[in-house]
Curated annotation (Swiss-Prot):
Protein's gene: CPK14
Binding annotation for Ca(2+) 2: 404, 406, 408, 410, 415
Provenance organism: Arabidopsis thaliana (Mouse-ear cress)
Recorded domain comment: There are 3 contiguous domains conserved in the CDPK subfamily: a kinase domain, an autoinhibitory (junction) domain and a calmodulin-like domain. The autoinhibitory domain (318-348) inactivates kinase activity under calcium-free conditions.
Catalysed reactions, semicolon-separated: L-seryl-[protein] + ATP = O-phospho-L-seryl-[protein] + ADP + H(+); L-threonyl-[protein] + ATP = O-phospho-L-threonyl-[protein] + ADP + H(+)
Transferase in keyword set: yes
Enzyme class: transferase
Signal sequence residues: none
Coiled coil ranges: none
Name under which the protein is recorded: Calcium-dependent protein kinase 14
Residues with PTM Phosphoserine: 218, 484
Function (record text): May play a role in signal transduction pathways that involve calcium as a second messenger.
Amino acid sequence: MGNCCGTAGSLIQDKQKKGFKLPNPFSNEYGNHHDGLKLIVLKEPTGHEIKQKYKLGRELGRGEFGVTYLCTEIETGEIFACKSILKKKLKTSIDIEDVKREVEIMRQMPEHPNIVTLKETYEDDKAVHLVMELCEGGELFDRIVARGHYTERAAASVIKTIIEVVQMCHKHGVMHRDLKPENFLFANKKETASLKAIDFGLSVFFKPGERFNEIVGSPYYMAPEVLRRSYGQEIDIWSAGVILYILLCGVPPFWAETEHGVAKAILKSVIDFKRDPWPKVSDNAKDLIKKMLHPDPRRRLTAQQVLDHPWIQNGKNASNVSLGETVRARLKQFSVMNKLKKRALRVIAEHLSVEETSCIKERFQVMDTSNRGKITITELGIGLQKLGIVVPQDDIQILMDAGDVDKDGYLDVNEFVAISVHIRKLGNDEHLKKAFTFFDKNKSGYIEIEELRDALADDVDTTSEEVVEAIILDVDTNKDGKISYDEFATMMKTGTDWRKASRQYSRDLFKCLSLKLMQDGSLQSNGDTK
């Protein structure tokens, strides 16, 4: 991101084309200060000592790369949010480029009432600190559920705001790539509070007609052309269309028990308008959804066309009749379960540590029988067998194809690390067990109500027993009032794969999935992309 004269991701892609190996600055070999060098992430931070100007307060949230704190400007007493990204969590050069690009995009975006404002940036030896506008009004779905009475009119207002954000992004050459309800917060708790886009971590700069092939985003909201690995800014309209569908009925339009199933449903693009409440939803609303979720991006509506659509234009006159308790209940369940999964994913991500990569590198040395610093597909297969990991030959080829970034027919140590977590997951669910242990504080073998309430203290309003009980009710299939490991594992693996514990591993996972879908004929690759 720092220097954005080229296209998004061009630095990484150009070097990969030339066979240039980007180092992992926090691998065991490199370390935080290798040969006296420090990792510098930002090109021009505001400063280096954030605590000279701001006082960091309570924790507001925690993500894959760091922690968000309440932040007070010492001189004025003004309150902000500070997103502190820990350098030790940036395990690959791609992670570092993501942070650079996120900051550059937020700096270049003009002020907009529905986009969170970046105030200042700081960088010290341990972290990058982003001081941003504070949004205290909660997540989109939580607000909807709390209101109780939910209508088409309310959905039209929300989607209009989201599309205006998309339009602003596209106008300034930014593709968001990760539009989902969790990435929108209300500015405050007032009824009239603005809805704001808060996360640009996967966004990229683009030029008209430019195509991308990196698989990013969240499964439910992913456009078919992302899986085909040839896409442009049209994917943001698709994601917004998925959000609109969920707003009107409470469940995603493309759903299955596994990520592979979700991907196939997306590629088929069959939209269900038969189940409740669709019979009472207006034809205009359904027409807009169909046009936003058109499988051909060339025929999908643009942001301006969405805003010009009759359902949006007449949004203030849209039906104000409640869509029913069923929709509200579904939205609540969808929101609550996302929170539990998200909390578990954070635990898993914390275990994908430098210590784990050290173990993986030891395995690489065992496989590298020729001692040339890279392994062939044969060595990979034999090595996996020796480690007791049974992987079908077809899957080994898929892993090899996905991991071999420079396409030289070998895996070097960094490429091996990038795919190894998926290899390990094929053999066991050790990270999922670690997540379960995190919740099961008293080692009873079950997650009990008190343990669940404590674990989700930062994520839900624990004054409401209703929320915690809703999770227990949904996950506890044998109705004994607590969650067993098997029930937890089933919940985590339903609908979206729990293994997306980190952004990079998610990219690798979907790359493998895309290759597999190509092999079984579910999709065809569309032309050359960047």
